[in-house]
A protein has these predicted regions:
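Structural motif
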Residues: 44-46, 107, 185
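Helical "lid/coupling" subdomains associated with nucleotide-phosphate turnover
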Residues: 13-28, 55-66, 71-105, 128-129, ...
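A cross-taxonomic marker for long C-terminal extensions/tails that follow the last structured domain
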Residues: 116-132
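Short glycine/serine/threonine-rich phosphate/pyrophosphate-binding segments
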Residues: 1, 91-94, 113-117, 271
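Extracytoplasmic
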Residues: 3-5, 102-104, 113
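Short amphipathic alpha-helices and their capping/turn segments at secondary-structure boundaries
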Residues: 1, 34-36, 120-122, 174-180
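A short acidic Gly-Thr/Ser loop motif
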Residues: 1, 108-116, 123, 189-192
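N-terminal glycine/serine-rich phosphate-binding loop of ATP-dependent small-molecule kinases
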Residues: 1-51, 72-77
Length: 287
């Protein structure tokens, strides 16, 4: 049972002293909430690094180092900081996000900071994972490693990376795992999805599920480049309940604090191109 949502967003994958300290401080805060407010025993506490973060750290053999450096002094020594694989995270995401009535008929895709993962259950109810070692922040780093130019060059570089390499990687994955394209409903999640829903459908801030269209994802991508100021300041005057309007504005502020313009662009370009490739077979797929 989820007792409360106390999520704290830190840029753990930045690998700076500041991001490491912020992550350690966040763990310390959450551990004290569990221990003091909810009296949850140490044996029931699990601290798990996301698969995307683990993949990035593993490239430099820093998984163990990172687990140690983000461990707050106050944390019970019996609590381990572990990690999860992309395949494990994909299956757990589907089980946690997709309603039970659609568990065996829908697909699910989660666009994380370091990777993108998802999948579906096949006719034999066996989970088929779909994973790509690229997410919002890792794609941003890849783009920035190839250009130091202005925003226009940034977008051109991102488009070239998709065209020259990423598209073939995606196509090869979907040739084998065809139900990602064929099924009628796909549940989407992750930071960039949260950002799109928050800015394109701000009134949905308190909803568990929000239906988006492929056109809205493409429009979000366009506005990031050509109409950024309008995008980040959506009109909330149509929300008639003051408390809801304040909650939606607070949600937008969280998005903008978490992601800068280039991070949003990287995530939007990757996600938009991915969705367009998925929709080549079934363009009316519900998202």
């Amino acid at each position: 049972t989820l007792l409360t949502d106390t999520s704290i967003n830190t840029d753990a994958a930045a690998w700076s002293y500041q991001s490491e300290k912020e992550t350690a401080d966040a763990i310390d805060i959450l551990w004290n909430i569990l221990k003091s407010r909810h009296q949850i025993p140490s044996s029931k506490v699990h601290i798990v690094m996301s698969s995307g973060l683990m993949q990035e750290l593993d490239k430099y053999k820093k998984v163990e180092y990172f687990a140690n450096v983000i461990r707050p002094v106050s944390l019970d020594p019996s609590i381990k900081i572990t990690y999860i694989t992309p395949e494990q995270e994909a299956q757990l995401s589907l089980l946690g996000i997709v309603p039970q009535k659609r568990r065996f008929t829908a697909t699910q895709i989660d666009v994380g900071s370091g990777n993108t993962k998802g999948g579906y259950f096949d006719a034999n109810k066996k989970f088929v994972p779909v994973t790509f070692p690229l997410g919002t922040k890792s794609f941003q780093r890849l783009i920035e490693s190839k250009t130091a130019g202005d925003l226009s060059e940034y977008v051109k570089t991102a488009d070239a990376i998709w065209r020259d390499s990423l598209r073939n990687t995606v196509i090869n994955e979907f040739v084998v795992k065809q139900d990602v394209r064929n099924r009628d409903i796909m549940y989407i999640s992750g930071g960039i999805v949260w950002a799109i829903a928050s800015l394109m459908r701000p009134e949905s801030c308190n909803n568990n599920y929000t239906e988006l269209t492929a056109q809205e994802i493409s429009e979000f991508r366009r506005m990031l480049f050509t109409d950024y100021d309008k995008l980040i300041k959506p009109d909330l005057s149509f929300i008639k309940v003051p408390e809801q309007e304040r909650a939606c504005q607070k949600n937008i502020n969280r998005v903008l604090k978490t992601y800068d313009r280039k991070a949003l662009l990287a995530g939007a370009i990757w996600f938009d191109d991915l969705v367009q490739e998925i929709n080549t077979v079934n363009p009316n797929k519900k998202l």
